[in-house]
Amino acid sequence: METTTEENIRIIFGLKLKKLRTDKGLSLQQLSELSKVSVSYMNEIENGKKYPKPDKINELAKALGTTYDQLVSLKINKNLTPVVQVLNLRIINDFLFETFGVDKGLLMSMMANAPTSLSALINSVFEIARNYNLQEEHFYFSCLRSYQEMNDNYFEDIEDAVEKFKADAGINQPQQLTSEQYMQLLKQHFNYRVQESDFSDFPKLRGFRSVYVKGEQPTLLYNTRLTEQQKIFLFGKELGFATMKIEKRPITTSWLKVESFDHVMNNFKGAYFAQALHINKESLIQDLEHLFAQTTWQPNLVLALLEKYNASPEMLFQRISNLLPKFFGFNELYFIRYSSKEPSKHLKEISKELHMSRNQVDLEYIINEQNYRRWITKTMVKHLDDKFHETEGTKTFVDAVISENEEKDQYLTISMLRPMPELNNNANSVTIGFVLTEAVRRKVQFLNDPTLKFEKLGNVAELHYETPYALRKKRDEEIKMAEYDRLTKELNSSVTV
């Protein structure tokens, strides 16, 4: 999680030099006269741009009343410790400095000059992160969600890339393409080798939906147990990576290891591309208009959309979440996905979550709102679970509810529950909900349907989430990565899997 580079060493040296100089009450000009080091060069040293030669370090050490060894040592006083902790975090280097181009030396200098209260705050953040076992990937996914929320979860550049690909590939979409057709597009347009595999020779990889191996001819192995809808999404995402020329992307589905924020962002772009490619924007907008025009809640219309678009509940709801803010003005919505073997009893760690809120500055409000939305998700799944077990977990169910929280905000929430026997025998739930704003009340005609369930906020403290165990997860990643490396070597040696 931590990294010390040559650049960081320069910055640490500059911070120490500046701290020693200011502690002695010396200006740059005064230290320059004492050390015979020019003001301009010293300024570059303090800003982390230059690292002085040994003779210059000796002169600076003498002028500051310290030794050469103390000056070049990476040991620092306690006031600078939080600054260097931030500097050495790989997550900060990858995300803030590399992705967004923030000037590292300037930021560190500003932090070093800040009052000690900032150091206390940084220490507190580190302590909280340790206590709650927060990992880099949590930060990356949180930043991605914020990025989606700031853009109303609609991305014109990806929509345009989809339309261009469809035109280039000659895709006219009155009918949905099959997974076989998407596979052929990968082979014909991007020279992919696509193979089905049960990963029998690689038991640690059996839980993955797919494994990608980069090479002169890219290879995509997909699990024999995937459903048609899962293959459609998988091949569509690969088409997205290839069309948008994305290099930094995950090598497995689900994630083997989260490498960087670029990987997280690019995975989202590939997934968005797949959804937009498979579910036509204009067609779905018309279908939503028809659904909202009904004066009574019609769950069968939602299930019919799954069949029409040959899509999984998650793909359908994700695509709906792209279009509602942009084309319907439903700007306060949320999306939650989780899976569990016993959905009526507990939530496993939520695997996907998006909250678009009216109040992005009141942290307490945001936390309360997100807890409430999780609570109504669990309440919805309890309703669906009874029906689910009546069919021994073989059918997909959908239901809607109007709910109210302590602030008297009302929501319309629609949730689906479906079996997932193909990989882990879990039941998978996807939920989309939106605040009953004036825009929603004007558009959705079935809100006054007396058959719609109504729920008031219950005890959100009842929610329990399984927290990840970082060490166990890291060991598991290492084992699977070794298996992936073995598979890659065999493929590159032209051994059939």
Segments predicted by a language model, with ranges:
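Short juxta-domain linker segments that transition from a proline/glycine-rich
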Residues: 2, 11-12, 19, 29, ...
